[in-house]
């Protein structure tokens, strides 16, 4: 076990939008340390979003992330030899992390040709409260609602 809790690293805002949330999704998109490629993908997706919605891409993105953020999640708790899925509230930082991760995961699973289009369409779908990432949030909430009886086992 570690002696002290690991400190949270500060995330610097990105150079174009001067926003830390944009930097965080760039870091989620990034593979093998190729940050420049991840930035090109996201900024290209933002251009597509601006063309399709005629709105500021940053506001669309922030609303999309807000629509995907889960309030509750299930944690497995072992009590007297049996496992229970206990619904717990998600901390604010983890809410954002899960939302960004789900947007990128479900963007990857889409059928569009380029990653730019996939990310753009997933963000637009999340903005409109449709799409796979919003469905994932709804499924998580349904599971938490179904296991509400075990909520008293929180720790």
From Swiss-Prot:
Segments traversing the membrane: none
Keyword annotations from UniProtKB, A to Z: Ribonucleoprotein, Ribosomal protein, RNA-binding, rRNA-binding, tRNA-binding
Molecular function GO terms recorded: mRNA binding; rRNA binding; structural constituent of ribosome; tRNA binding
GO annotations of cellular component type: cytosolic small ribosomal subunit; ribosome
GO biological process: ribosomal small subunit assembly; translation
PROSITE patterns referenced in this protein's UniProt entry, alphabetically: RIBOSOMAL_S7 (PS00052)
Keyword Chaperone set for record: no
Highest taxon in the source lineage: Bacteria
Pfam families in the record: Ribosomal_S7
Keyword Signal: no
Family, similarity comment: Belongs to the universal ribosomal protein uS7 family.
Function: One of the primary rRNA binding proteins, it binds directly to 16S rRNA where it nucleates assembly of the head domain of the 30S subunit. Is located at the subunit interface close to the decoding center, probably blocks exit of the E-site tRNA.
Assembly description: Part of the 30S ribosomal subunit. Contacts proteins S9 and S11.
Name assigned to this protein: Small ribosomal subunit protein uS7
